[in-house]
From Swiss-Prot:
A GO-annotated cellular component: cytosolic large ribosomal subunit
Gene Ontology terms describing biological process: translation
Gene from which the chain derives: RPL23
Similarity comment: Belongs to the universal ribosomal protein uL14 family.
Protein name per its UniProtKB record: Large ribosomal subunit protein uL14
InterPro entries to which the protein is assigned, alphabetical: Ribosomal_uL14, Ribosomal_uL14_CS, Ribosomal_uL14_sf
GO molecular function: large ribosomal subunit rRNA binding; structural constituent of ribosome
Key words, A-Z: Ribonucleoprotein, Ribosomal protein
Amino acid sequence: MSKRGRGGSAGNKFRMSLGLPVAATINCADNTGAKNLYIISVKGIKGRLNRLPSACVGDMVMATVKKGKPDLRKKVMPAVVVRQRKPWRRKDGVFMYFEDNAGVIVNAKGEMKGSAITGPIGKECADLWPRIASAANAIV
């Protein structure tokens, strides 16, 4: 299994079900003015021939804005996935999933571009990204 690096974050993450392959469109859960994000790559994935790199909650991805403010569109920017629809199993045996796929726009260090997050975020994301956890109103 390939190592999954975390740029600019502390802590480790257990293996999760990867629910968001490259070319997935996810909602933007912050107040930057972006409506949705298009995943173009996943940070820290080495991969295998013909296998699409995929992301899960807590992963940093490179994304572009497909709908939103004109000054945000047509630029590649880092984002962190905070919710996914695909169920994953936690170490305590609980299967967890959200009702949508969502991410927040960050800088290379993992600091949020926006100041607020709409909706809950996963505990796995909150453990890895403290700046995102402080802006979240609910951590599940």
